[in-house]
């Protein structure tokens, strides 16, 4: 009797899960159903982008101003990269060469840094004596230094850039 009760409960749970869209069944030739959990699908990035965590990154080698670099990233469906941890900093450091624009800006109010993607500035790795908070130096770059620390520069300078967007 206990076995029958357990089987009925299991069948009801699976039926409800399938009804709620949690399971996607694939029938085999023997008529068995092999459940595939949708929440377990792999995250992917478009061609040319690399996956790290839940975000995709695109290294743009063409040198351009900070404003054009941001517009280029937006055109690709993202923004200049925001960096939220040492792990992300190290990942980006490994996929870029030289100086690159990243998504930080303080052009509206000197010293009030924000990311172009709207996420909070919750991690910082400024170079020593930076930022200098001069309003003309209001765009953020990752330097070519070994540690790839951040520096504030005038936005009209031309550099490569790194874009980021959510993986799908």
Curated annotation (Swiss-Prot):
Its subcellular locations are: Secreted
Q: Per the record, GO CC terms?
A: extracellular region
Q: Could you name the domain of life of the organism this protein comes from?
A: Eukaryota
InterPro entries, from UniProt? AntifreezeII, C-type_lectin-like, C-type_lectin-like/link_sf, C-type_lectin/snaclec_domain, C-type_lectin_CS, CTDL_fold
Primary location class: secreted
Cystines in this chain:
45-56, 73-163, 107-138, 127-149, 139-155
Where does the signal peptide begin and end? 1-17
Supply the alphabetized keyword list: Antifreeze protein, Disulfide bond, Lectin, Secreted, Signal
Propeptide span(s): 18-34
| Stated consequence of mutating residue 112 to F | No effect on thermal hysteresis (TH) activity. Has 60% thermal hysteresis (TH) activity of that of the wild-type
Which Gene3D superfamilies does this UniProt record tie to the protein? Answer: Mannose-Binding Protein A, subunit A (3.10.100.10)
PROSITE patterns given in the database record: C_TYPE_LECTIN_1 (PS00615), C_TYPE_LECTIN_2 (PS50041)
Q: CDD domains, alphabetically?
A: CLECT
Q: Which Pfam families match?
A: Lectin_C (PF00059)
Q: Which residues form the C-type lectin domain?
A: 52-164
Example GO molecular function: carbohydrate binding
Query: Briefly, what is this protein's role?
Result: Has antifreeze activity to protect fish blood from freezing at subzero sea water temperatures. Binds to ice crystals and inhibits their growth. The thermal hysteresis (TH) activity, the ability to lower the blood freezing point, is approximately 0.45 degrees Celsius at 0.15 mM for this protein.
Name recorded for this polypeptide: Type-2 ice-structuring protein
Q: Which organism is it from?
A: Brachyopsis segaliensis (Sea poacher)
């Amino acid at each position: 009797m206990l076995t029958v009760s357990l089987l009925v409960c299991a069948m009801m749970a699976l039926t409800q899960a399938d009804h709620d869209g949690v399971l996607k069944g694939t029938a085999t030739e023997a008529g068995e159903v092999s459940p595939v959990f949708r929440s377990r699908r792999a995250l992917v990035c478009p061609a040319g982008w690399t996956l790290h965590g839940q975000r995709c990154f695109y290294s743009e080698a063409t040198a351009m101003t900070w404003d054009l670099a941001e517009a280029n990233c937006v055109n690709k469906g993202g923004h200049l990269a925001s960096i939220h941890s040492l792990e992300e900093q190290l990942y980006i450091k490994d996929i870029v060469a030289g100086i690159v624009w990243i998504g930080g800006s303080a052009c509206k109010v000197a010293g009030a840094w924000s990311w172009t993607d709207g996420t909070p500035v919750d991690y910082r790795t400024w170079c020593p004596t930076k930022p200098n908070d001069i309003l003309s130096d209001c765009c953020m770059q990752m330097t070519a230094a070994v540690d790839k620390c951040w520096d504030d520069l005038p936005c009209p300078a031309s550099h490569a850039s790194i874009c980021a967007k959510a993986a799908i």
